[in-house]
Amino acid sequence: MKLDSLFRPLSDAPYQYHLGTGLHTLGLLGWILQQTGRADVYVSTFSTSDAFLSGFLRLRRRNLIANATLVADLKAARKTVQLYRLMQSCFDHVYLAQNHSKIVLVKNDNYQVAVISSQNQTYGDRAECTMITTDTFAFYSLLDGLRSIVDNSHELNGL
């Protein structure tokens, strides 16, 4: 899906929305990083996948991601642990918590971008809803909420 046909540049629109099929979080993250440049990335999801992690690793190897944190759900822990080695290559920190939220936060000196989505970091052909905002208040409100989740989580280390 051509993201430029769905969304305007981040600098032109502080709030953007999409409801439909064909939009995947990984592609959206790549589109955002093309505009922001190298940034810290926070991902919160119920579940993740090999495909998402492999794509995330490609973004990291292209030096688009500085620091990265993943917060996943405890109930999806079996799948998460099976993907842990790949996660180690992608993320500086991986946390398991009571989490069903699906957000991506992208931050550097010039941008604070928040993505709120109904989509897990998996692939499917179902309709999903996504909102992108560059509103600073929204970004930091979500970051504070994510920190609260992390404060009540378990960090995966060296499995």
Kindly give the residue locations of the regions a language model identified.
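PLD/PLD-like phosphodiesterase catalytic module centered on the HKD motif
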Residues: 1-159
